[in-house]
UniProtKB/Swiss-Prot annotation:
PANTHER family: COPROPORPHYRINOGEN III OXIDASE, MITOCHONDRIAL, OXYGEN-DEPENDENT COPROPORPHYRINOGEN-III OXIDASE, MITOCHONDRIAL. A divalent metal cation binds at residues 101, 111, 150, 180. The gene is hemF. Involved in the heme biosynthesis. Catalyzes the aerobic oxidative decarboxylation of propionate groups of rings A and B of coproporphyrinogen-III to yield the vinyl groups in protoporphyrinogen-IX. Substrate binds at residues 97, 113-115, 263-265. Residues 245-280 are annotated as: Important for dimerization. Pfam families: Coprogen_oxidas (PF01218). InterPro entries: Coprogen_oxidase_aer (IPR001260), Coprogen_oxidase_aer_sf (IPR036406), Coprogen_oxidase_CS (IPR018375). The active site is at residue 111. It comes from Coxiella burnetii (strain RSA 493 / Nine Mile phase I). It is found in: Cytoplasm. This is Oxygen-dependent coproporphyrinogen-III oxidase. Homodimer.
Length: 310
C-alpha cells in the first residue's frame, strides 16, 4: 500500500509540474519580454514548493503560478472543516495554484487551482481526494467572454457526464461569494472538493482534462482585451474591485487558510493578492454606466452557456 500511495503522489506531481511549465510558457508568450522568476522553498520536515511570479509586465501586472508538495502528521483545520472525522490524520498534499492580475482593466483576473490529498492513520487504508477548479473575475463585462469561458468549462466536464458541469458550476457560485457584501466575486466557473466518487484513474483524468482546458478558456479573452483602450476611470474601478478579491482571499478562502495554518511559505501563499488596490467607503457606480452594468448584469447567477450569441 505504501508503494501505491507513493505512485499516486508521483503521478499527480509530474502532471502538475508539467502544467505549471506550460502555463508559464503561454503567459510569457503573451508578455513578450517579461519572465516568471522562480523561487524554490522547503519547509523542514514538511515538503516544499516551486513558486513562479511575474511582476510589472506589459500585460500581467502581477501573476503567480505555484506548485507545492507538502506533508505532515496532522491535517490543518482548513482541510478538515467539512470532514472532522479525518482530523489528526497524517497527510501528503500536492497542488498547483494560479492567479493572474492583468494590467488592463478590460482583462479579467483569473484563478485556477488543482490539488490532491492523501491521508490516513496508517498505510493500510489511506483516504485520497482531488479538489480545485477555475473562476473568472471581470471588471468590465462582455457576454461573449463569459459565454466562451463557461462553454469551455462545460465541454471539459461533459466528457464525464452531463450532470458534472451544472453541479460544479453551482458549487463555484456558492463558494466564491462574499457574504458580508452580498455579492459574488466574479462570474464563476468550476469548483469541487472531495472528488473521489470514481476510481483514482478516472478522477485524475478529470483533473488533467480540466487543467488542460484552462488556457483554451482564458487565453482568447486575454488576447482579445489586452489592448483595449482605457483611462484613469477604468483603472480606478479596477483597483476598487480588486479590494473584493483581497477581502475574499483573506476572509474566506480555504486554500489561503490551509497554507497559513500549515506554516507554508507566506510569500507564496499570498501571491494571490493584487499588487495595488484601493477601498472607497460608500462608493456606488453611476447609474447606467459600464461600472453599474457589472453589478446588474454580471455579478449575478446566470446560465452563461445559454446566453445568446455566436
Amino acid at each position: 500500500m505504501r508503494k501505491d500511495r507513493q505512485n499516486k503522489i508521483t503521478e499527480v506531481g509530474i502532471y502538475l509540474k508539467d502544467l505549471q511549465n506550460r502555463l508559464c510558457r503561454a503567459f510569457e508568450k503573451e508578455e513578450g519580454e517579461s519572465r516568471f522568476q522562480e523561487t524554490l522553498w522547503e519547509k523542514p520536515n514538511g515538503g516544499g514548493g516551486r513558486t513562479r511570479l511575474l511582476t510589472e509586465g506589459h500585460v500581467i501586472e502581477q501573476g503567480g503560478v505555484n506548485f507545492s508538495c507538502v506533508y505532515g502528521n496532522q491535517l490543518p483545520p482548513a482541510a478538515t472543516q467539512k470532514h472532522p472525522e479525518i482530523s489528526g490524520f497524517a497527510f501528503q498534499a500536492e497542488g498547483l495554484s494560479l492567479v493572474i492580475h492583468p494590467r488592463n482593466p478590460y482583462v479579467p483576473t483569473v484563478h485556477a487551482n488543482f490539488r490532491f490529498f492523501i491521508a490516513g492513520k496508517d498505510e493500510a487504508d489511506p483516504r485520497w481526494w482531488f479538489g480545485g477548479g477555475y473562476d473568472l473575475t471581470p471588471y468590465y463585462g462582455f457576454e461573449e467572454d463569459c459565454r466562451h469561458w463557461h462553454r469551455v468549462a462545460k465541454k471539459a466536464c461533459d466528457r464525464f457526464g452531463e450532470a458534472i458541469y451544472p453541479r460544479f458550476k453551482a458549487a463555484c457560485d456558492d463558494y466564491f461569494y462574499l457574504k458580508h457584501r452580498n455579492e459574488p466575486r466574479g462570474i464563476g466557473g468550476l469548483f469541487f472538493d472531495d472528488l473521489n466518487e470514481w476510481e483514482f484513474k478516472r478522477c485524475f483524468e478529470f483533473i488533467k482534462i480540466l487543467g488542460d482546458s484552462f488556457l483554451e478558456a482564458y487565453l482568447p479573452i486575454m488576447q482579445n482585451r489586452k489592448n483595449h483602450p482605457y483611462g484613469e476611470r477604468q483603472r480606478e474601478f479596477q483597483l476598487y474591485r480588486r479590494g473584493r478579491y483581497v477581502e475574499f482571499n483573506l476572509l474566506y478562502d480555504r486554500g489561503t487558510r490551509f497554507g497559513l495554518e500549515f506554516g507554508g511559505r507566506t510569500e507564496s501563499i499570498l501571491m494571490s493578492l493584487p499588487p495595488r488596490v484601493v477601498w472607497r467607503p460608500n462608493w456606488e457606480p453611476e447609474p447606467g454606466s459600464e461600472e453599474a452594468r457589472l453589478y446588474e448584469d454580471y455579478l449575478v447567477r446566470r446560465n452563461w452557456v445559454s446566453v445568446s450569441g455566436a
